[in-house]
Amino acid sequence: MSPKIKVIFFDVGNTLLFPNRERIHAPLAERGFVPDAERLRDLECRTKNRFDGIMTGTIPKNGSPDHGFWWMFYSQLLSEIGLDDDAVRDQLVASIRNSGNWDTIRPGTADQLHEIGERYRVAVISNADGKIEDVLLRCGIARCFHTITDSGLVGYEKPHPEIFRQALKSMNAAPEESLYVGDVYSVDYLGATGAGMRAILMDVPGAYRDKGVPRVESLEELQIALGDGESRGAT
C-alpha cells in the first residue's frame, strides 16, 4: 500500500491561475485578429502533445532548438491565422511569460483550496519569474499555501529535480507522501515523479484524455479523486 498523501504541491499557470488573454493578445486585436476560446483550447492540446514529444524524445527536433512551449504555441497560432511577424510572436511570448498577466482565476478556487487545506498541507511549485507570490496575493489565494517555490528565485525550473527537492525541503515533506498537481505531462508529471513524488495532471483543456495518465479537469474533480482511495492516479 502506498503511503498516505500528506502534502499537495500545486503548479500555478493553467492549474490555479490562467492567462489574461485580452491583455496578452492585444497585439493581435490591434491587427484585427481575436482568436476564440475553442481555437486556443485546441491549439493548447496540440502544442502540449508536441511539446511533450520533444521533451521526451519521441518527436525529433529536426535540428532546430526548442524555444519552449509558448514559443511553439504562438508560432503555430500566427501560422494558422496567416500573420507572419516574428516581432508580434516575440511580444506575445514575452507577455505570457510575465507572471503578472496570469491573473484570471476560476470562481470558487479560494474556497476549494481552503477545503483541500483542511485535509492536507498545501504549497506551490511554479516555473515563474520571481513574482508569482505577488500574483497569488493579488488573486486572493497566497495565504492558502504554506510555502511558494518560484523557479525565478531558486534558480531551477521544472522538470529539474532540484526545484522539487527544494520545495519538499521547505515543507519538511517526504516525496512519497507528496502529490504534485500540474498541467504539462513532460514538465510537471514526469518532473514530479522523477523526484519521487506522486503526480496528477490538471488537464483543463482535455489534452490528455486519451493518454492513459492520471488527470482531473478541475479542483472539484481533484477533491473527488483525493477522497476516492487516495486518488485515481495519485497512488
Region locations from a protein language model:
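N-terminal helical cap/lid subdomain that shapes the substrate entry/recognition surface
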Residues: 2-110
